[in-house]
């Protein structure tokens, strides 16, 4: 959340992962540079709160950097803790500019309802969402509606693909199977595993003589830490975010997430 990402950073707050703004910025770059869409063809469907604002700011920043007009972005709203997406659907239908992709910053039920109500109206639409949506919950909800609603939906992630072979993902799966044999791997628990891994590394480096200030100093001196992500984790006195990388995944016709290259 933006509240926990002050600049300069709060001394006692460290974030492992990329921000929602970084996720949506990566999505816009993918849509423009890989899918060859014009910035004007991208809309945003976002919750009306700080979470939605954070995602929208990433889209606006990326579109500005690509030479587009951030002030003309079609922003589709819905109220937090609801699935009332009718106004957003109407706005999309009335848009004078043909929209080819919607970057979503939602909860999973609202995302599914929005896709359900617009998929047939815009069969070629590209739908993307940030990781907060809950990848498993979104895929399950869409598959209940039918394969055509789920297939092709893109979700950005802040950890590597679950079906990949990075050493950290393999370690995570082994630990999950050992300690929680009834649980299935998912992106939410993998993110927690990664964050805990970083903290444990800092605790070990700090040693037994531990207090808050010493732990903060140890974290701020973590540089190029390799925990098997495929990208290093680094902090500093003015940098309390360890990783800025965003990974791409896409739901296939069986409701499973497949990795995609965002660049």
Show where each model-derived region lies.
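Second-shell loop/turn segments in exported
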Residues: 10-18, 46-49, 75-78, 99-100, ...
């Amino acid at each position: 959340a933006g509240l926990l990402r002050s600049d300069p950073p709060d001394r006692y707050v460290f974030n492992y992962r990329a921000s929602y703004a970084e996720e949506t910025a990566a999505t816009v770059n993918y849509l423009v540079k890989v899918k060859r869409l014009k910035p004007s063809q991208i809309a945003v469907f976002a919750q009306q709160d700080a979470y939605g604002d954070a995602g929208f700011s990433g889209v606006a920043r990326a579109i500005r950097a690509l030479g587009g007009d951030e002030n003309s972005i079609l922003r589709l709203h819905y109220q937090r803790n609801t699935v009332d997406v009718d106004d957003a659907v109407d706005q999309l239908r009335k848009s004078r500019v043909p929209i080819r992709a919607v970057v979503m910053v939602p909860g999973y039920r609202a995302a599914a309802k929005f896709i359900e109500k617009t998929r047939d109206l815009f069969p070629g639409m590209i739908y993307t969402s940030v990781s907060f949506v809950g990848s498993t919950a979104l895929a399950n909800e869409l598959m209940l509606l039918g394969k055509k609603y789920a297939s092709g939906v893109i979700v950005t992630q802040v950890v590597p693909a679950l079906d990949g072979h990075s050493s950290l993902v393999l370690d995570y799966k082994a630990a999950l199977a050992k300690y929680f044999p009834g649980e299935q791997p998912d992106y939410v628990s993998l993110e927690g595993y990664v964050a805990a891994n970083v903290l444990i590394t800092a605790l070990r480096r700090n040693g037994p003589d531990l207090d808050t200030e010493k732990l903060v100093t140890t974290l701020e001196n973590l540089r190029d830490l390799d925990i098997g992500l495929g990208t290093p984790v680094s902090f500093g006195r003015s940098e309390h975010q360890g990783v800025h990388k965003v990974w791409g995944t896409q739901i296939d016709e069986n409701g499973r997430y497949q990795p995609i290259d965002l660049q």
